[in-house]
Amino acid sequence: MFDDILSRWNAVFSSVTVDDDPAEALATFIRAKVEMSRLYPLASRLFAMEIMQGAPFLMTHLRTNMREWVRGRAAVMQQWIDQGRMAPVDPVQLIFLIWSSTQHYADFQVQVLMVENKAEYEEIIVETQAQIAEV
């Protein structure tokens, strides 16, 4: 179950190469992650609970597949940075930031709705995706 969740979350960014446009690639990844939060909020919450419990079922995956995936994506971003095509940031920390900010919409749905004074979750996701596309 968790492998499927993680594969879906990261699929869009898995095929990104140094030849891709960094802004487009990152925006596409963010939009996809926000959409996953909208479509599969329970998956995000289950993953968060697994991590908060010390990752008893995911430890091996995190140490192997996930670590390798993050390092591969970070290497692509580092090349973009080295080429002057992306602002100098720590690529691994950027991945963590994208994961956390996009999954926030699923994990803290009640908070987002109350703060935004919205009755429907989907309104917020649609607005967020539109804003990301403009960046």
Where are these regions (language model features)?
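Alpha-helical structural segments
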Residues: 1-16, 24, 28-35, 60, ...
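Active-site micro-motifs of SAM-dependent methyltransferase domains
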Residues: 8, 53, 100, 104
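Helix-loop segments that flank and shape redox-cofactor active sites
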Residues: 18-20, 53-54
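Amphipathic alpha-helical segments that line or abut small-molecule/effector binding pockets
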Residues: 23-52, 92-99, 130-134
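All-alpha amphipathic helical-bundle segments outside canonical DNA-binding/catalytic cores
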Residues: 24, 60-65, 82-97
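C-terminal peripheral helix-coil segments that are non-catalytic and often amphipathic
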Residues: 35, 39, 67, 71-85, ...
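Amphipathic alpha-helical segments used for helix-helix packing
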Residues: 38-60, 108-115
